[in-house]
Amino acid sequence: MSTLNVPKETMSRKDPEKFFTIVEKLGEGSYGSVYKAINISTGIVVAIKKVSVDNDLEDMEKEISFMKQCKSPYIVTYYASFRKENEVWIVMEHCGAGSVCDAMKITDKTLSEDQIAVVSRDVLQGLAYLHSVRKIHRDIKAGNILMNHKGESKLADFGVSGQLSDTMAKRQTVIGTPFWMAPEVIQEIGYDYKADIWSYGITCIEMAESKPPLFNVHPMRVIFMIPNPSRPPPKLTEPEKWSPEFNDFLAKCLTRKPELRPSAEELLKHPFITKAKSHSLLVPLIDEQDIIINEKGREVALGIEQRDEEEEDEDEDSEDSDDNRGTMVRAKPRSMQNSGGEDNDEEYDTGTMVITDNKNSYDTVVFNNDDEDSGTMKLKNTMPSNKKNFVPDYMNQFKKSDDDVTNVPLSDKYSSYSLEELKKMLAELEIEREKEVQKTLEKFSINRQALLAVIDEKKSK
């Protein structure tokens, strides 16, 4: 490929619009929106992530530094970065087929076992490279696996990635997406690259079933349930429908003790991977996705355009509202199906918690050690709403309302609504859920800090 015409310096102050023309919005990542763009002088297509400087600039610099150091065909390539007014533009390789998550969402399909094996071979190659240079991705999921039109996969979105230095053999901060997080990450007992292996095991289930295990469980309960040693490791909902090789591969990825969990290099030798077929197996899925995108446009196919309009309406409404959710970033909810997740929720010491939006309707959670940040929790995710006074039924149940409507069978209650009305009601329900999450987290953080203060005081006596 030709060389891009871009400044060599990091965080260049030159105007990026003199180098690139934005074509369309591709999606929304954990740290900002991503756009397809063309390098004006060469015609090369790239992806540009625009990140508001309201976010932590230090984190962005870490991400850029991380990407610049990575040189692998299985890792998205970094090209340049710009600082423009209140935004940072990160220019990177464009993977035309988008993420695995987007492909599933747009086509409303899951991946076959053979397709999962092909993706897994590429992902494990990428992880093997990262781990060999002492780096941890820390946010492996289908939304962070990008594909090109050949069906080749690459790891992306290093917003929460970390590097293992010689003086810090194991990370002590907890950063990742709760449904995909390894037990040792949540327990804050220190972790290494094996955490990525667990996350990829969860990602394989996500690719097979469209959602990760426990997706229907409250996020706060999830972080209590995953580390519970009495809970069996996650597995496919119907393992008998999948090959013994795939089930065994998952079991190895999802080994609870990290010291017994195989490395990426070891997993590349597993029969499930060694028997993986050609990248061309992914092409039919990509072609089907492209047909839908050509008919509707990518933003409509992903629901981005509708969400942006709803956000504008919400912003207008919020000007006159006392309920200031200025720190929250709205995301479109995905439809939820009950998978019968267990309800055991023993509590664990989870530290101070930060939830940031990853735009896949699943929150990215950051726990900090007490010595790093004992401040209040931040919640940067909620859903769009057009009805401020809407109260979902589960809230009425909490209030023990005597309203007869709570006794109406749910299927009868909602059957008369149109599809669009049901979608809006689901979005509003998600808003109430996020409000309850925030209240719970605030209470949890306050109580924990109070307990720690008393413990420290007693220790000093």
Swiss-Prot record:
Active site per UniProt: 139 (proton acceptor)
Phosphothreonine, modified sites: 173
EC number: 2.7.11.1
Domain Protein kinase: 20-273
Inactivation phenotype: Cells exhibit reduced viability under hyperosmotic conditions. They produce smaller aggregates on membrane filters and do not form aggregation streams on a plastic surface under submerged starvation conditions, but are normal in sexual development. During early asexual development, the expression of cAMP related genes peaks earlier in the knockout mutants. Neither cAMP oscillation in starved cells nor an increase in the cAMP level following osmotic stress was observed in mutants lacking krsA.
Keyword Repeat annotated: no
UniProt: ATP binding residues: 26-34, 49
One GO location term (cellular component): cytoplasm
Gene3D superfamilies, per database record: p53-like tetramerisation domain, Transferase(Phosphotransferase) domain 1
Localization in the cell: Cytoplasm, Cytosol
Stated name of the protein: Serine/threonine-protein kinase 4 homolog A
